[in-house]
Amino acid sequence: PINTDGVNFYENNLEVSKATLDQSLTMQRSLNIKPELEASSDSDLKEKLLNHPQKDFWHEKMIWYGPSGIGTARSLEGFIDHHQLPFRKTFKERNYWELGHYCELGDGKFSLTAGWHSIQAVYGSNDWLGYNSNKNKVTMRVMDFYHHDEGKIRENWVPIDLAHILSQIGVDIFK
């Protein structure tokens, strides 16, 4: 984490731990609001995402750390431009909650949610990672590690099993 307090050997305040986890879960629930279903253009969708309820949870200096192939994004606008916009355009048909992040942990200023599999979706366009759409149903193995600072989510590390997703759309990266 940017403030180097990621490793500690003491018990954290349970109230703070519960609050950080609650903040992460509430933000994640807001992600199921899907402005991409009504957007008329990329710029319209970007504007809708900039004003989406998620904005209330992210720190103004947020950093989103995605896996190789997606990369890192700074600020809500960077996150929208480099991950959310392509992801939402590709996976318009998705369900975060049927499988869900069933592992949930709050520990001081840090929280974790994960599910192996955690998201179901339909691969609907080539906007995310550039592979042609085949309308295949996919499941995603995703973990979210959050660092909370100044009452907001400051950092988010998101390992996504891209090899697993690619194999479900017919791309074998191991050949």
Where are these regions (language model features)?
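C-terminal and inter-domain tail/linker signature
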Residues: 1-175
